[in-house]
């Protein structure tokens, strides 16, 4: 019997490409994580709009990135390096089946950058304007950043700046290329669209607008953390390598370092944020801990193979510790209503973590590398600010960036999409009632539970249990048990002064940290 002859290179390539496919699917699973995280941090009347934007980010984004984005990245890489470029070659992946796995891996990163923006502009941006920006960030803004870095452009070792300094920009899995790009773009969008109604008082003081579900926000955070292993560990794309003797070598040490630093950064960020929020508010806040966990991950995303394990722990802790101060600076000083705190979580943490890589590098400190890191962070941020401002301004000119005041008050679910994620809060459709019409709240009208028909249990009069105050059971009408103060079950609890608070903790917030 002739022994089976196997080419080690073929085996290694096959295993590595299967690995890339698997982690690409894992990174895709971050999309529902983003959807849940953002949905939990907005009010119930805007959840459908959040879900629509997140689905659009992916569905439209992959089409644009396939037709345009990936090619733009290659062209920018050639334009900003001595190598030059060929337009036809830049788009050759479209017809090359051998390049499609690599394209998919790049696409899931591009979609992440786009999705981050949604959380900053939630609850007031016109959907058409958002679609324009989503298409542009995946087709042009992010691909330019990719071209400057990962596609061999300006900041890479072979790019003009990298060659001049003798070192290339270090960002392993996209702390700045993906996350800071998305976070800065979100900040620009939030500034240009303006704050939500009621977000700031007459004298400019912060007025928290709590989201409707801490549960969804934390669940989304944990799903994102799970997908992040694909993001970071998956970027270590070589699982098997060939040796000089023709054998195969498992790259366990490299994979292990990335996995360990990712995990330590995640944990350190969460604990640091818990400590800071406790010091700031007097009690540990679950949402701030969730934000710190994500910020810790962002902070180490660019650093995971380059720093020591303890360096990763420190970077993660820094990322988590600065989330609350960065958010408060954004809201209190800049007066920007960043609903989900994406600039603090993705922008600031990504910039700090990537800039400090040389300080904790495995090979020791390098001043030249530090210069490159700081320059790279600045260049990426500057490009993102300018490009995003132009696109948002253009979209605003054509469509208007913001929905009407009436639509914002009613909720974007009804105004933009004609749906409600929680129909029991607002009544059902029926022959005499349009979809989304609120159930009556005028002290004697009908309680409806059957799509529009009247349900009465006392011969026609309203059910009363408190000597005259109305008790309603349709998930959105007023329940009165105290002689006058309204208790609502549609996400807001209203006290004597009409200010919405959260149950059990009137300073807690679930909208990215909007605490007094």
Swiss-Prot record:
Residues spanning the membrane: 17-37, 59-79, 101-121, 130-150, 170-190, 214-234, 258-278, 286-306, 307-327, 342-362, 374-394
Compartments it resides in: Cell membrane
Role summary: Involved in the uptake of ammonium/ammonia (NH(4)(+)/NH(3)). Transport is electrogenic.
Induction remarks: Highly expressed during ammonium starvation under nitrate-rich conditions.
Gene Ontology CC: plasma membrane
Gene: amt1
Annotated membrane topology: Multi-pass membrane protein
Top-level taxon in the UniProt lineage: Archaea
Family designation: Belongs to the ammonia transporter channel (TC 1.A.11.2) family.
Pfam families (alphabetical): Ammonium_transp (PF00909)
UniProt GO BP: ammonium homeostasis
Positions of region (Disordered): 426-516
Annotated protein name in UniProt: Ammonium transporter Amt1
Alphabetized InterPro entries for the sequence: Ammonium/urea_transptr, NH4_transpt_AmtB-like_dom
Site (Twin-His motif. Important for optimum substrate conductance): 179, 346
